[in-house]
Each structure stands twice: as C-alpha cells, then as structure tokens.
Amino acid sequence: MIMNMKNIFYCLLPGLLLGACSNKVYEKTGDSVIVKVQHKETGGPRLVRLQVMGDKLIHVSATADSKFADPQSLIVVPQKKQTSFAVVQNGDTITVSTEEVKASVLASTGEVWFTDKNGELILQENKGGGKTFTPIEVEGTKGYTVCQVFESPEDEAFYGLGQHQADEFNYKGKNEELFQYNTKVSVPFVVSNKNYGILLDSYSFCRFGNPNDYSQLNRIFKLYDKTGQEGALTGTYVPKKGETLVRREDSIYFENLKTIENLPKKLPLMGAKVTYEGEIEPAQTGEFKFILYYAGYVKVYLNNEPVVPERWRTAWNPNSYKFAAHLEAGKRVPLKIEWQPDGGQSYCGLRALTPVNPEEQGKQSWWSEMTKQLDYYFMAGENMDDVISGYRSLTGKSPVMPKWAMGFWQSREKYNTQEEMLGALKGFRDRKIPLDNIVLDWNHWPENAWGSHEFDKARFPDPKAMVDSIHAMHARMMISVWPKFYVTTEHFKEFDENGWMYQQSVKDSLKDWVGPGYHYGFYDAYDPDARKLFWKQMYEHYYPLGIDAWWMDASEPNVRDCTDLEYRKALCGPTALGSSTEFFNAYALMNAEAIYDGQRGVDNNKRVFLLTRSGFAGLQRYSTATWSGDIGTRWEDMKAQISAGLNFAMSGIPYWTMDIGGFCVENRYVAGQKQWNATKTENADYKEWRELNTRWYQFGAFVPLYRAHGQYPFREIWEIAPEGHPAYQSVVYYTKLRYNMMPYIYSLAGMTWFDDYTIMRPLVMDFTADAEVNDIGDQFMFGPSFMVSPVYRYGDRSREIYFPQAEGWYDFYSGKFQAGGERKVIEAPYERIPLYVRAGAIIPFGDDIQYTDEKPAEHIRLYIYQGADGEFTLYEDEGVNYNYEQGMYAMIPMKYDEATKTLVIGERQGEFPGMLKERTFTVVTVNKEKAQPFDLNAKGVTVKYNGSEQTLKL
C-alpha cells in the first residue's frame, strides 16, 4: 500500500507558528528530551524527542500517537547512555546542547534544526516542521507512511544511499527508490558535503527525493500516435518471422511478469523488433524526470534527439536508467523508443514525474512506506570521515578483513567439477599470476537438492580433498550459500516444521529454472532461531571441510526474478517481526548476522568473511562485503560501477566489489569467444571483449576487493587472451602491482577498524573545499595516496582528468609532476589506466609475491612523493584471527616534513606473535626535479629498522 500523494513533492505542514509558549513544554528523561507539539495539525507529529547519542550524534524521533512505539532498532547497536547535556527553553524553542552541537525543537510545529556549538546552522528541517504521518494498516498491523524534509542550500551535495545502477553520483536534486534487488543495494543513509549525515531508521520501501511514484505516460501527457491521433502512441511489433502487428499503446508499462501479459499475445519476442512512437504533450512547463526500465537492447529519442543511447540488459535481470527533459506546456514533442527484446520473455517501460519547483526538488526529502514512528539520526563531523565514524559508532565498527581477502579472487559461473576448480587454481600457480582466493558458485549440489549443502558426488567426489588441495596451493576457498531450499530437502523441512519458511512460493507452486524446475522456499532471516538453524546447517555440512569464506547469494531476498513489488512482498513475508511491507529491506543484514555470530560462536579465532549480493545499514559490523550483483557486460555498466562503488563507500560500508568484466554477457561476445576457440581468429566483437575486460581489471585492481566473476566466456585471464597479448600483459601487471601494494592496502584495512576509514574514496572526501569535485563520480582515491581514473569507453586512448586542488600530483608510471586545480586530457594507452599519486604521499611497497602470506615483508620500499608534508602508518597483525581486538598488532608511524626534507620512521607501537623484529626499508624519493617512475629495483636510501625511531634527511 503506497501512499497516494497527488502532485505533492515535499511534506508541508500547513500550520502557522502561533506564538511562543510561556510554559514548560518538554520533559527530560535520562538521555532524552520529549517535546509535546503545541499546535498539532492533521498529519503532523504530536511528540518530538531528541536523544543524545554522543557529542555529535542526535537521535530524532517523532510520532503522531500519544506515546512513542520505540521498536527495537535493527541497525543501531546498543549504545552507552549519554546524560551530559544541557536543556534550555526560550519561548517555544527547546534546545539540547552537547559540547559540539545543539539541536532545537520549535514546540509550535515540531520543527527541528541543528547548529554547531557556536550557533552556526548545520541542518534545518523544512520550515513548518517537514514531517507528515499518514496511517497505514497491513495484515492487521497499524503504522504510518512518513515523510521528512530538510532545507538544503544550493551548493549542498549528497552521497550514499547504497549502490544503484543509474550512474548517478551526487544525489542533490535527484530521486532514488530504496529497495533491494539484484544489482540494487539500498542503504537509508546520506553524507552531505556540509559535513553531516542523516540515517533513516526504517526497513520498508523508501524514497529519497520526490516521494511520488513515477506515473504512466498517459496520466501526465496527452499522447498522439504516429498519425497524429490523440490518446495513445503507436506500437509496432515486427517479429523475426510472421506478420507485423501495429496497435495503439496508452502507456509503456511492461515491467514485470504481471504486466508483460499485456504485450501482444501472439507475438514471439525472441528476435522481434519493437518501436513505440508518436508525440507527448505536457500540461505544464518544467523539467520532467523519466525512468526507463529495460531488458534487451533499447534506445530512446525525444524531440528527434537521442536521450538514451543504446543500452542492454539480460531479460531475467532488467535495469533502470533515468533521464530528464525540459518540456513546455502545450507543445507536442516527438517520442520514439526502439526495443529489441532479449529472449522469449523481456521487459520495457517508460514512466515519468511531473515538474517540481527546483527549490523543492533540491531539498533533502525522505519517504518511508511503513514504520511505527519517524526515527532518524543526525551526525555532525569535522569532515566526511568523521561523519562516517559517527555512523559506525551507531551501527557497528568494521572488523579488519582477513589479509588474504585483500588479494585477487578468481571466480566464474561456474566450476562444474572438482577438477575444473583445481585446474583453474593450478593455472594461476603455473603461470606465476598472484591469487589468494578461488570461488565455488551455485549448483555444486545434486540437481534436485538445492539447500541440502551436499556436494554432487559425481562431479565433486571428495570435497574435503578438494579444499585441502586448494590450501596446499596456498589459496583459500569461498563457497556459494543461498537462503533458498528445495521443499524435498531435510533442511527445508527442518525450517518449515518450526514456522521459519516463507510460504507464498510454496503455496503458489513456484518452480525455479533448474532442470525441469523445482519447488522451493526461502527462510525467514528475521527470526533469531531461524538464523541459528541456518548457521547450524552450514556448520554441519560445510565448515568441517575447511571452507574459508561464505558467499551469500540472492540475499535481497530475490525469491523470484521480475515480479511486481506487491508480489515480492508476499514472497518474503510475513516475517517474524511483522509484515514484509514494514520489514522489506533488512534481510541481508539479518542473514549476515546469522553467519557472523554463528562462526564466531564456534571458532572465535578465525576471521569471518562474507560476500553478499545485498546489504543494509550496519552490514559492516558482520565482516561482510557487498558486490554489485549480476551487472551487464557493457561499457556503460562498467562506468556505472564507479559511482555505484563510491556511493556505497559513502554509505558507511567500506568493503565493496564487482564482477570484473560484468556478469551477464551479450551473445555477440559469446560468439566471438567460440570463434576464437575454433579458429584462433579475433573478430571485432571479441577484440572489444578483450579490451572491455582489460579496462575493467585495471579499474578493479583499485577497489577494496579485487575479484573477477561472470558467465561464459571464462574469466581466467589466459581464457580471455594469450600470454603475449596486451590484455594478458596488462591484467598480470596490475595483479602483481596489487600484491606489491599489499603493505599499503592491508594498512588501509587496519584503518577501517581503528580509524573508521573508507578505502575507496570519492574525491569530495579528501578535497571537500574544492567545489569542482562535487559531481566527479568517475575518479576516486584509493586510500590517501592514489587517484584512479578508469577508462570506460571502447577505443579510448586518453581521457579527461581533473586534478583536485592540492600541492601537486605525480604520474605513477613516469614520476612526472602535475599541478593541482587543473583539467587535462591524459594519455591512456591500452595497457595502462591513468594513475596519479598525491604530493606528500608515503607509500610502502613489498616484493613480488604469489599470495599474501607467502613471506614476511622483510624488505619494504618506501616511496616518498615530495612537495607536501605527509604521513602514513604501516599496520600489521597476524592476518587471520581476532587477536588484534585484544591489542595484538603493530603500527609503524611515518612522517615526512617538506620544509626540512626529513622522513621520520617512528618507533614501532605494539607487537603480535610472529612479528618481524627487524626489516629493511629502501626509501625512494620522487619530486619535481626527479621524475622517478615506480620501479622495484629503483635505488634509494637503505635503512635497517629494528623498531626504534629512525630519522632520514632526504
């Protein structure tokens, strides 16, 4: 039940400020202040509460009821009660003050605003209160559809919200629907360039920006077909064989299994070509925002201009793309959609939102379909890192990942036999290509036994020996585990007899795509006992084999592809906590809790690693990374992963990855691979496939987790290109470089725990004062030192780069200096990605290794990029256990002073079992006068280090 808010963009309380209240209108209770709203309007709050969570953290609650419901938060961990704050009433304004921030409530409306300790405004709710409550009842449970709006200055920018696929970076003035789906991970948290964050504590379907649903075209436009007749567009359906069908279409809405029934009944979509064309006439002037939903190939033309160049997505996992157009009231504009469906079942839709006043569109607006009360957390910071630190203090710290997780991961859909998997690993070792992890995807079980956690003995005759062999080759193994169970398995029955299995798919006799199709269900991860059973079954079947990591697939949960929203809710509910309308988005968080708590409960000395296809606020506390799902193998998909990964990082969850090369493969690439296999000739498509993978690997080497995966063609580099090919050479170069960088990378992993650091960083995090970076979503920092600029267009051998305002930058490959505050077109040959190092960087590089724990880093090359002061802390621990939580780790602080050209390698702090007592540093300097390329054999100043402070004049 989605609230109908016709033509309302922001949630405006119409009440006027009716004067000051002379009486005390608040109640202080421990760590909170409750304000009774004096002039409640229909749909407004009756109570507003400010709860102090820390000097920079304020929890705001509001309710339209006479008391707060206070449901248990799924995302906020238990907090120490804060009582050190002051409360002052001045007229009808009640102000709560900590040492760092002030939060005020206007008792006449419930409006809240936040300032720093000096009274400078940080954030203000929409004038008049900005909060509305509309009653909703689902499955006998009452709640509210809520909306919260904040004022926003013109120069503000917003980041976060999880990771989405529309290739949007700065969400200022944008709209995003927050729900979980394959390739779409929603996190209700944003960070502002004004150095604050807002976390909405809601688990239902939400919207950021315009709270209205996109409308069918005929509801906001007059439609004209290609002959000029009013009332519809013209739909022309040309099958591969047979007669062309032409009919009038009053909407383009074929977006799910239900609505594609409205396509022409006798039209075979396979090989068809479809055109929707005519004219649209708006009733008002302004910017209309469109959303295109597509599977197959699609193009969109508006006013005879291409507004959506060709895009593609596989039929079973459609994608959305957004665009905007300024249209004038009463003026007819040509519209044309060209669609080539993918397969016999495919999807296409185009909907739109009517214009909104730009000032209102630019505000920060949140809408939640169902919640008991409004709850959000305000966190202020000195910078964006400080804001994210506040987020993690609320939702949980991010543990140090196992060191091997920072190496290279090889995966494919899928290794069908034990021999295939071991053969792939042996291929890396024989070719001396570094690797730490190999992955076994779904379908390693007997065909009719999904969820049994058993191996198909014909294909995997000895799983324990397989895992042992992987370990003997100094690699780790991750295995795919789903929350899905065939109804015939004992595991399903064990859940079902306790009432812990979602029933709708069973009642509807849904079958999956395997073999003849099998009946199945998903377990309810919201039930704590069900979570314990989920881990117990994994522990009994998988854990004794020595498996190192867990791949939580379909954790949205994606019970069935391509269903409408209401049926999706039916398939994943009711939950143990309530209706799936209220608890729609947090499944992956609950599922991750099952594995993390389960493994730490049985083996607290082995670091947990989870990779999940979905996520939610707080996911980081369960040692869980997210990958961006089953994305397409297209250049536009590769580009979209840059902004997706950056916004996911800004959502407070530091570990993210993607399928390098994309998952779903266009048929032309498959045909190119088969031609190569048969004839060793490279056609145009296969040439592009190789370049696409090369550019994607170059990008992937600089994200938190470096991982290749996808459907056929196989993704091992020697399957993509032979050893002498530039694609092969480039991928091997960056894989080896990743391992040379391991002292740097693992130190970043340590910083995520100790300093709440973010590894993959949009430029705005480090250069907030430089307004030029606010909208740059295709460059990023990898840690404090490297600026990465992926190449994402076929055939490009250069790209424009903005160099943020800093003391300077150095080309990593040549060592040449580049000034900051400039835009330049930089060469990007096939084999190289533009990579620059910030002046002041101190970067530790290790020797060539084949896996992360091959040997201790006895010799480290310290590259000092002069031109600015710099510092870095080398972090080390045992790499595989939780002893660091007990203080068993070592840090070596390093500082460079530009004025004196002095490097101080500080006294080592801490120790751990197996720690190197002594090592050698070779210090290599790079400066404007000496363009020193990166070279492991470069000469420098050698220092013997035994843990005592060393000072070097450079």
From Swiss-Prot:
GO terms for molecular function: alpha-D-xyloside xylohydrolase; carbohydrate binding; hydrolase activity, hydrolyzing O-glycosyl compounds. A lipid is attached at residue 21 (N-palmitoyl cysteine). The keyword Hydrolase applies. The active site is at residues 553, 556, 630. Keywords: Carbohydrate metabolism, Cell inner membrane, Cell membrane, Glycosidase, Hydrolase, Lipoprotein, Membrane, Palmitate, Polysaccharide degradation, Signal. Pathway: Glucan metabolism; xyloglucan degradation. GO terms for biological process: symbiotic process benefiting host; xyloglucan catabolic process. Residues 227-366 form the PA14 domain. Optimum pH is 6.0-7.0. Residues 1-20 form the signal peptide. The keyword Transmembrane helix does not apply. It is found in: Cell inner membrane. Its main location: membrane. Its EC number is 3.2.1.177. It is a lipid-anchor. A lipid is attached at residue 21 (S-diacylglycerol cysteine). Disruption phenotype: Severely reduced growth on tamarind xyloglucan and completely abolished growth on XyG oligosaccharides. It comes from the Bacteria. One of its GO terms (cellular component) is plasma membrane. Catalyzes the liberation of alpha-xylose from the non-reducing terminal glucose of xyloglucan oligosaccharides in xyloglucan degradation, converting the 'X' to 'G' units. Gut bacteria supply the human body with energy from dietary polysaccharides through glycosidases that are absent in the human genome. Xyloglucans are a ubiquitous family of highly branched plant cell wall polysaccharides present in the vegetables we consume. Enzymes involved in xyloglucan degradation mediate the conversion of otherwise indigestible plant polysaccharides to short-chain fatty acids. This is Alpha-xylosidase BoGH31A. The lineage of its organism: Bacteria, Pseudomonadati, Bacteroidota, Bacteroidia, Bacteroidales.
